[in-house]
UniProtKB/Swiss-Prot annotation:
GO terms for biological process: microtubule sliding. The keyword Cytoplasm applies. Pfam families: Casc1_N. It comes from Mus musculus. This is Dynein axonemal intermediate chain 7. Its main location: other. The gene is Dnai7. GO terms for molecular function: alpha-tubulin binding; beta-tubulin binding; microtubule binding. High expressed in lung, kidney, and testis. It is found in: Cell projection, Cilium; Cytoplasm. Keywords: Cell projection, Cytoplasm, Ubl conjugation.
Length: 730
């Protein structure tokens, strides 16, 4: 029999008093914890407020210190920024020297500055008749050079030195040269086509000719046999040509493809001229000279009057007081010497004042011109038609392809040792295709489009598939309709498309395809030389800036280096920018670019001050892109900065610098931080300029290099920064 299980001991029941005691202990513990938490919070809050008070006092002290020395720092900055008007003065001298050099060379070419010489050159060329195509191409080198020189005059000469009449004269010279060159090419084409029968190919019986130089390439084909089966026209050793319909294959026509590397069709953009600021320096100079001459004239009259009064003294008195007269003569000589010295001193002071006034006015004019480079227009011009190409959004590249179906002129005929030719008074005529007719169209007769194959020149880079547009001669604009079946062979750079009616065509690309930039960096490469690197979605550009010249050092497309014709060529900033734009490497925003690009907009005055002061420091300090520049508002910029004396020297660590135009400060945070903070870096202060901010921790060698930088170099660096606008378009 199994033993009985023992009963579990019964749990002792808690009394009411014990329950009350436990509840009381729990309440006391809760109150104690709450009190401890309250005391801890109050202590932490007091500590936080104390830290804030100390920081605020420190901040106020730094602000007070900054305000006390602001006037002194701005005066020092003004002395350093005197390099900008000095650089402009040197550029004036360079322009004057270039004119003098042209005058002394006597090479027969006109001076582009002198409208009369340009008019004479144009008139003489108009009188030259029946020039062969090779002669026209040779002459075109000089003509294109003159056009580029006149364009550079309009672009490089400050607007305050250009009056409206001069601008119109130069623009008129450009248009007349462009029109005359086009006319000469047409006449030369007509002369060539008159000899088509003599130049016919033995195999096909048709004439084919290719003439090319560095500016122009002519492809011309004359349909002499009128073979209806010969509808594919391909120029020898190329894939360039036409696919023509039967009606053209049986007509007395010629096909011309004239590729000009230049664009003389797109209208010139107007040059802004400020009438009220025309030559302010010269006007002030005249006023100063007039006042100086007036003062010197009054002094001269006073001296002459005094001398006349002395001559009228009675001789008797002079005889009686001979000794006194001798003493007076002695004192008079001393007085004249003092007057002469005073006059010389006043003349020197007047010249000094005049020079200071001239430089001050020039400095203000330069500052205003620089500010225009970073200002944006408020409204965008409205497009009148949907098919009209917006030249604010797109840019033409690769020149112009003039596609023409021409009526074959009467051929030369040899008769008894003579060459007879019928010369048409109307000259070279275009064959109308499709024909204009007022009658009802015949449904059995069709006019299919003409297929064209072009080769894109290697001097142009397209980051997207190029778009083909045609010229509207009546409306004077590029239009995108009337072109179909576009195919682009990227490897062979061949573009095939069809057109209803042949005419001038060009290729366009989004002008802002490389904006905004992904990053940028500017580093010194020794004295008066920097390397500016700009990275975009498609490419990386490396640009050297040395004194008053720029050079394309490297082009990388999707990480791969590219051999390019512009590499290694030193050019002045404006021609350099134009060359990059014409090559498709556009990193230069226009005043309307902000309508097409999402930008990090900055106040123009802040942006301008930053670029000017970065240029002043560029010989000894590197500057770079910071992601925090997007975080701060439009009144401040954030950049990375470090001292760097050359490419070989050991690099310092990057620091973050914030600048508002009136105050510069080093930030405590680093580029890698997750949150933006305006806290000051330990041991740093506020300053009114970037120069004085960097001076606090820079080496003496670096600051010495900054103070002795070349003014042309500083001006060129500033101009490139203003043109690329790395702070707003990155």
């Amino acid at each position: 029999m199994a033993p009985k299980s023992k009963k579990a001991p019964s749990k002792k029941k808690m009394t009411k008093a014990e329950r009350l005691r436990l509840m009381q202990e729990e309440e006391e513990r809760r109150l104690k914890e709450e009190e401890e938490a309250r005391l801890k919070f109050e202590k932490e809050e007091q500590e936080r407020l104390e830290i804030q008070r100390i920081e605020r006092e420190k901040w106020n002290l730094l602000e007070k210190k900054d305000l006390e020395r602001r006037s002194q720092e701005l005066e020092e900055l003004a002395l350093l920024e005197g390099c900008f008007p000095e650089a402009e003065k040197q550029k004036r001298e360079i322009r004057a020297l270039a004119q003098w050099k042209h005058y002394t060379e006597c090479d027969g070419s006109p001076d582009p500055w002198v409208a009369q010489e340009m008019n004479t050159f144009i008139s003489l060329w108009e009188e030259e008749k029946n020039q062969a195509f090779e002669q026209v191409m040779e002459k075109s080198k000089l003509v294109l050079s003159l056009i580029e020189k006149v364009k550079l005059i309009l672009l490089e000469t400050p607007t305050y030195e250009l009056d409206h009449r001069t601008v119109l004269q130069h623009q008129g010279s450009i248009l007349r040269l462009q029109e005359l060159l086009s006319l000469k090419i047409n006449v030369a084409t007509e002369l060539l086509l008159r000899q088509a029968s003599n130049l016919a190919d033995l195999d096909t019986g048709n004439m084919e000719k290719i003439i090319k130089d560095e500016n122009v390439t002519l492809y011309v084909w004359a349909n002499l046999k009128k073979n209806p089966r010969h509808r594919s026209v391909r120029f020898s050793e190329t894939q360039i040509g036409f696919e023509i319909p039967r009606i053209l294959a049986t007509s007395n026509v010629a096909l011309r493809l004239l590729h000009t590397r230049y664009d003389h069709i797109t209208p010139l953009f107007p040059i802004a001229v400020t009438e009220q600021n025309q030559n302010p320096v010269g006007a002030e100079q005249v006023n100063v000279e007039e006042s100086t001459e007036k003062a010197m004239t009054e002094e001269k009259l006073f001296t002459e009057e005094k001398a006349a009064n002395e001559d009228e003294q009675p001789k008797a008195e002079q005889e009686r007081e001979l000794n006194l007269v001798q003493e007076e003569n002695k004192y008079e000589a001393i007085e004249n010497t003092v007057l002469q010295r005073t006059s010389d001193s006043e003349g020197e002071d007047s010249q000094t004042t005049q020079l200071e006034l001239e430089m001050k006015l020039l400095s203000e004019a330069v500052l205003a011109a620089q500010l225009c480079l970073v200002e944006n227009v408020v409204e965008l011009p409205e497009a009148s038609q949907a098919y009209k190409v917006d030249l604010c959004h797109f840019s033409t590249l690769g020149g112009v392809y003039h596609l023409d179906v021409l009526e074959l002129p009467p051929q030369c005929k040899p008769v008894k040792g003579w060459v007879l030719v019928e010369i048409l008074q109307e000259g070279l005529q275009r064959f109308i295709y499709p024909p204009d007719t007022t009658e009802e169209p015949d449904p059995d007769v069709t006019f299919p489009p003409i297929e064209v194959t072009l080769e894109i020149h290697k001097s142009v880079i397209f980051f997207e598939r190029p778009r083909v547009v045609r010229w509207d001669n009546e409306g004077k604009f590029w239009r995108s309709d009337g072109i179909s079946s576009v195919y682009y062979n990227r490897e062979d750079r061949l573009l095939t498309f069809s057109m209803d009616t042949l005419g001038p065509v060009t290729l366009i690309q989004d002008a802002h395809v490389n904006m905004p930039y992904q990053s940028w960096e500017m580093s010194p490469c020794g004295m008066n030389k920097v390397l500016l690197i700009v990275k975009t979605v498609f490419m990386e550009l490396q640009i050297y800036i040395k004194e008053n010249l720029c050079m394309l050092a490297s082009v990388k497309l999707r990480g791969k280096g590219l051999e390019f014709h512009l590499k290694g060529k030193w050019m002045a900033p404006i021609p350099f920018i134009l060359a990059l734009k014409e090559a498709g490497l556009n990193i230069f925003p226009a005043v309307y670019s902000h309508f097409y690009v999402v930008i990090n907009n900055k106040v123009p005055q802040v942006e301008l001050k930053a670029y000017r002061q970065m240029a002043l420091l560029s010989s000894a300090f590197s500057f770079g892109w910071s992601k925090w520049n997007m975080v701060c508002n439009s009144t401040r910029v954030v950049i990375r900065v470090r001292e760097q004396l050359s490419e070989e020297t050991e690099h310092h660590t990057w620091s973050l610098l914030m600048f508002s135009g009136d105050r510069a400060q080093m930030l405590k945070m680093q580029e890698e931080n997750d949150k933006f903070s305006e806290a000051l870096r330990e041991g740093t202060e506020f300053h009114s300029t970037l120069y004085h901010m960097m001076k606090d921790f820079a080496s003496p060698v670096a600051m010495e290099r900054v103070r002795h930088s070349n003014c042309q170099f500083i001006d060129s660096v500033c101009y490139m920064l203003l043109s690329i606008r790395v702070l707003s378009y990155s």
